[in-house]
Design a protein with these regions (language model features):
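Non-catalytic cap/lid and distal C-terminal segments of serine-dependent acyl enzymes
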Residues: 1-250, 254, 258, 263
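Hydrophobic alpha-helical segments, chiefly the membrane-spanning helices
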Residues: 264-270
Length: 270
């Protein structure tokens, strides 16, 4: 692992790091905010998974999460959304290929050699973080925006006991029935739709739910509302009697992380 930069931020440290990924078979970059409490011992960790076209930089630079994380003494990791490099397959469309890994393990060419984002987020990066930073890996929460909200929800439900809470802002909630999902799942996983189910939050909710609280924050004037399909997830949560909060707002808030996410994660991590 190599350090790209480390800067003082709200009495803590905002770092950017790169490492060779065995899962994605390329160099991967991530950002990590560590509060000052990490100098004394391990601190809880919150994951922020970003959406389509994003890198590790988007939420790190735009969200203002560091101030709130510093106030509550938690770390925040901002992974990239896909593998990178000249030899990594890509597509002319913004919603496939680089910047659009969809948090799955691709089985189809040309994506399979590098697009193993599920293994990267679920296994490789957590191990790297735990080995190199003062993090309490027994206290983790996860959140995400859009495609990242999809990833946060599916990871949380597929990895019971890993995360104390999951929060999602405008998540792609039912990708197997959406143009933001069917296209990508078919490209990465193939035409057998039975392999798609573990990557659909609505289907996972109906099957197993989540063993902790869920927060969904959705703007009702979102121009992509028909692609996100929050109503399907809301119905599944109601049927499952899931411990969940669905917040609807007339205003679609542009920043990918809100103070509410931090506060919610802190409440669940304490």
């Amino acid at each position: 692992m190599k350090t790209i930069s480390e800067n003082a931020s709200f009495r803590g440290t905002q770092g950017v790091y790169t490492h060779r990924s065995t899962a994605c078979n390329c160099d991967m970059t991530f950002a990590l905010f560590l509060p000052e409490e990490a100098q004394q011992g391990p601190v809880p960790l919150m994951w922020f998974l970003s959406g389509l076209t994003c890198t590790h930089e988007n939420a790190m630079t735009k969200a203002g999460a560091q101030a709130w994380a510093a106030e509550h003494g938690i770390a925040v990791v901002f992974p990239d959304t896909s593998p990178r490099g000249e030899d990594v397959a890509d597509d002319d469309a913004y919603d496939l290929g680089k910047g659009a890994g969809f948090y799955v393990n691709a089985t189809q060419d040309p994506w399979a050699p590098h697009f193993q984002m599920w293994d990267y987020i679920a296994d490789e990066l957590p191990a790297l973080l735990g080995e190199n930073f003062a993090l309490d890996m027994d206290r983790q929460a996860i959140c995400g925006h859009s495609m990242g909200g999809h990833g946060a929800l599916t990871l949380a439900m597929n990895l019971p006991g890993r995360f104390t809470s999951v929060s999602a802002f405008a998540p792609i909630a039912h990708p197997t029935t959406s143009d933001w999902g069917r296209k990508q799942l078919a490209a990465y996983l193939g035409s057998d739709e039975t392999t798609w189910a573990k990557h659909d939050a609505t289907l996972l909710m109906a099957e197993r739910g989540f063993d902790g609280p869920i927060l969904i924050d959705q703007g009702t004037d979102d121009q992509f509302l028909d692609l996100l399909k929050p109503e399907a997830l809301a119905e599944a949560m109601a049927k499952a009697r899931q411990n969940a909060t669905l917040r609807l707002s007339l205003i679609h808030i542009s920043e990918p992380t809100r103070p509410l996410y931090i506060s919610y994660a802190v409440f669940c991590l304490k």
